[in-house]
Amino acid sequence: MQYSEDRIDQEPGMVLVVEDDEDIAQLLCYSLRKKSVPVAIAHDGLTAFALVEQLRPALVLLDIMLPRLDGHEVCRLIRSHPDRDLAGTPVVMLSALGAPQDIEKGMELGANAYFAKPYSVKDVVAATMEWLGTGEGNQ
């Protein structure tokens, strides 16, 4: 996992899980809901970006290899959005692309953190809870 220097201090809020693998999406959502985190799911990049604009999530868990629009482009669209609050939405990339250059690209595009698959769902949830400011990281 890699983090950027930009951390946030905000109240817990809704997390948008963007993952085309239904099993992984459901596991992430189940694990977050167990921590009382509201979640929404998108299975492709176009839907994900539309939901970011509509729902204004507190954080986006974003797969990279997605149908219709890849995660890199979704992150680019979020970061270049004219609404500066929306453009600052924390993005945590989740990807099978785990080579150093892949992680570097994700971070350069504006990801706040990057988990390479296979990642521990427990670690992703703990990091999410830290980003949301709940102090429940490893509980």
Segments predicted by a language model, with ranges:
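Short hydrophobic/Thr-rich beta-strand motif most characteristic of the beta2 strand and flanking loop
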Residues: 36-43, 51-52
